[in-house]
Amino acid sequence: MPRLARPAGAAAATLALGLVAAVPATAHEPLVTDARVLTHLDLAAGQTPENIALDLDGSADVTFAYARQIAHVTDDGRVRTRATLPAVAHAATPLLHSAVVTGIARAHDGTLYVDYATGTSATGVWRLSPGDAPEQIAALPADGLPNGLALDERRGVLYVADSVRGTVWRVPQAGGTATAWAKGAALAPLQSAPARGLGANGVKVRRDSVWVSNTDRGTLLRIPVRPDGAAGPVETRAGGLAGIDDFAFPGHGRSVLAALNTGNRVVLVRADGTVTTVLTAQDGLSNPTSVAVRGRTVYVPSAASTTRRDPNLLLARLRHLIGR
């Protein structure tokens, strides 16, 4: 999640309100091993990675939120800017008060899609086709905060998690009008402490369902996709995930690797709701924002949003894929 425009004391108080007690990984067989920082990023230059999409060759594309950039990170850690989204005069993004690039998704042909939150008419989904400049393909409400982004190429749609409006938007992959696909209390931010104003955050498509994290509520949600494309009832799959940001599936089942931003942890949330910590600040995490998995390699960007030290991209290895 991007750094909120709040006093440091309030942020510290939020963190102090308690982190979920997780089941420790066994000392003899940790699920995630060989953690290393692939590249250390430049905080002063605005290189604070908010989200990640993987390329076929093992490299990655990340969003640098406040720099408004889409950057490419090679498999040996070199960083180059793919594109910078246009500056916006008088940006008024809710909670953040600045224009930020948040979620990112990659199509099979290399086209990238990102969320751009500005508090203006530029808020929405933008497309970056290979060799082209970024272009807006769908508008979203200026008073919202589009955050996570997921692509379902089979249905030809994108899903956007709006953290302020507590809504999952559905956008045609080719561009067009966004529709409110799912909303309600389970997706909304809290209205009282320990509220940060962030509801629906990360989003992923998994077979015939859309999974969403809710940061304020510390929950992981599943929303079935009905045969006509409409949203089914929201199911809570896990709770107690304080500071949850974005997440990924480390196998073919319903287990999830989730970034707990404020707790500097990545946890495994199994299908039965049990939680195990698999990576911590000792491994190099510094406000992790998202997780991606390709094969048995785990990618975790850290934005250093409150630690204010060492934004980075960390790699680790799964001992095995998770089948449940």
List each model region and its residues:
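Secretory targeting and sorting signals
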Residues: 1-28
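Beta-propeller fold detector
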Residues: 34-41, 79-87, 135-139, 178-186, ...
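Beta-rich, blade/repeat-based domains predominating
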Residues: 43-60, 88-115, 140-158, 186-209, ...
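Beta-propeller domains
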Residues: 62-84
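Short loop/turn segments immediately following the C-termini of beta-strands
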Residues: 65, 117-119, 163-164, 173, ...
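A short loop-to-beta-strand structural motif that recurs across blades of beta-propeller domains
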Residues: 69-71, 124-126, 167-170, 219-221, ...
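Short loop/turn segments that connect beta-strands within beta-propeller blades
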Residues: 73-78, 128-133, 172-176, 224-229, ...
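Asp-box/WD-like beta-propeller blade repeats and closely related beta-sheet repeat scaffolds
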Residues: 119-153
